[in-house]
From Swiss-Prot:
This is Keratin-associated protein 16-3. One of its GO terms (cellular component) is intermediate filament. Residues 6-81 are annotated as: 25 X 2 AA repeats of G-[YCGS]. Keywords: Keratin, Repeat. Transmembrane segments: none annotated. Interacts with hair keratins. Induction: Expression in skin and hair follicle is regulated by HOXC13 and by GATA3. Strong expression in narrowly defined pattern restricted to the lower and middle cortical regions of the hair shaft in both developing and cycling hair. During hair follicle regression (catagen), expression levels decrease until expression is no longer detectable in follicles at resting stage (telogen). InterPro entries: KRTAP_type_19. The lineage of its organism: Eukaryota, Metazoa, Chordata, Craniata, Vertebrata. The keyword S-adenosyl-L-methionine does not apply.
Length: 86
């Protein structure tokens, strides 16, 4: 696990980013650990908080900028609540 630039211009740690498995922290707005895109892990994708994957995995958290439980694709962008892999 090495440092990388986060999902979108933030400092973070982990590995992967867009499309591999691997988690890192922080992205744009809030601190939060999570995967970049198409993986699984713990944290938010873009700027929220919670656990889950960023774009197309599975877990507990939000995809883009809110918080919720299991977001998949941008169906949960900027929102919160239950969501699935669409």
């Amino acid at each position: 696990m090495s440092y990388y630039s986060g999902y979108s211009g933030g400092l973070g740690y982990g590995y992967g980013g867009f499309g591999g498995l691997g988690c890192g922290c922080n992205s744009i707005r809030r601190l939060g650990c999570g995967c970049g895109s198409g993986s699984y892990g713990y944290g938010s994708g873009f700027g929220g908080f919670g656990y889950g994957s960023g774009f197309g995995g599975y877990g507990y958290g939000s995809g883009y900028g809110g918080y919720g439980y299991g977001c998949g694709r941008p169906s949960c962008c900027g929102g919160y609540g239950f969501s699935s892999f669409y």
